[in-house]
UniProtKB/Swiss-Prot annotation:
Gene name tied to this protein: nadE
Taxonomic path: Bacteria, Pseudomonadati, Pseudomonadota, Gammaproteobacteria, Pseudomonadales
Reaction catalyzed: deamido-NAD(+) + NH4(+) + ATP = AMP + diphosphate + NAD(+) + H(+)
Gene3D superfamilies, alphabetized: HUPs
GO cellular component terms attached to this protein's record: cytoplasm
Summary of subunit composition and partner proteins: Homodimer.
Organism annotation: Pseudomonas aeruginosa (strain ATCC 15692 / DSM 22644 / CIP 104116 / JCM 14847 / LMG 12228 / 1C / PRS 101 / PAO1)
UniProt name for this protein: NH(3)-dependent NAD(+) synthetase
Length: 275
């Protein structure tokens, strides 16, 4: 199993475990510089990111805000901005956490787009949903939610001349735990290559409250399973996923689940097929 662990870790460009606080600070500086370079290369000056209330978007948001603040200071150009976007579906169960994230990030600008009416209007027009079992329909609509959020973020970025930030990291990438062309769609992914505990380490070092750093992760896309934990969907824990990514020992069954899921979701990590 160790060779497949190494192969997958290499494919996902997994970063080595942090050995010290200096390693954490180095990763923060590296990723802020990456965000800044993406803006410079694009010729654009605005960043857009959806804030969910989870640690991933919180961490990416903190990095983004620091990136534009530093650019303003370095260049004197006040046009560099970060827009944090709330994209609730109706009333979000953990709205308090989302608001706490916004208060922590203190973005240059905040916008709210309730995706509920758009999701409902589209679902009502889809004949393919008719007659589906409730759980299957709920799952499909959950992916619609993720894709509507993508549309909203790109609309804002298009209107304001900006780039959309993604929150994907190695622990989600290995499990394919994102919606294809939904939350998997972005212009830059500053958390790439990080294990889940490393994302938390960055969040903690950036000043995030501990209750948000250690919050139980949930995609919260399905109405029939509100607040359903990521780990319950995975069938393995994030600690096991992180151990796998870093080539450390873990339960044989957990390793098998991760490898099987990685292969099953490979299409999500590839460009569209072409002749």
């Amino acid at each position: 199993m160790q060779q497949i662990q190494r192969d997958i870790a290499q494919a996902l460009q997994v970063q080595p475990p942090f050995q010290s606080e200096a390693d954490v600070q180095a990763q923060i500086a590296r990723r802020i510089a990456f965000i800044q370079q993406c803006l410079k290369d694009s010729g654009l000056k605005t960043l857009v990111l959806g804030i969910s209330g989870g640690v991933d978007s919180l961490t990416a948001g903190l990095l983004a805000q620091r990136a534009v603040e530093q650019l303003r200071e370095q260049t004197g150009d006040q046009a560099y901005r970060f827009i944090a976007v709330r994209l609730p579906y109706q009333v979000q169960q953990d709205e308090a956490d989302a608001q706490a994230s916004l208060a922590t990030i203190r973005a240059d600008e905040e916008q709210t787009v309730n995706i509920g009416p758009s999701v409902k209007a589209l679902a009502e027009q889809l004949e393919a949903l008719e007659g589906l079992e409730p759980a299957k329909s709920d799952f499909v609509i959950g992916n619609i939610k993720a894709r509507i959020r993508m549309v909203a973020q790109y609309a804002i970025a298009g209107a304001r001349g900006g780039l959309v930030i993604g929150t994907d990291h190695a622990a989600e990438a290995v499990m394919g735990f994102f919606t294809k062309f939904g939350d998997g769609a972005c212009d830059l992914a500053p958390l790439s290559g990080l294990a889940k505990h490393q994302v938390r380490a960055l969040a903690r070092a950036l000043g995030a409250p501990e209750n948000l750093v250690e919050k139980i992760p949930t995609a919260d896309l399905e109405d029939l399973r509100p607040g359903h934990p990521d780990e319950a969907s995975h069938g393995v824990t994030y600690a096991e996923i992180d151990a796998f990514l870093h080539g450390q020992p873990l339960r044989e069954e957990a390793a098998r689940v991760i490898v099987d899921t990685y292969h099953k979701t490979q299409h999500k990590r590839e460009l569209p097929k072409a002749p």
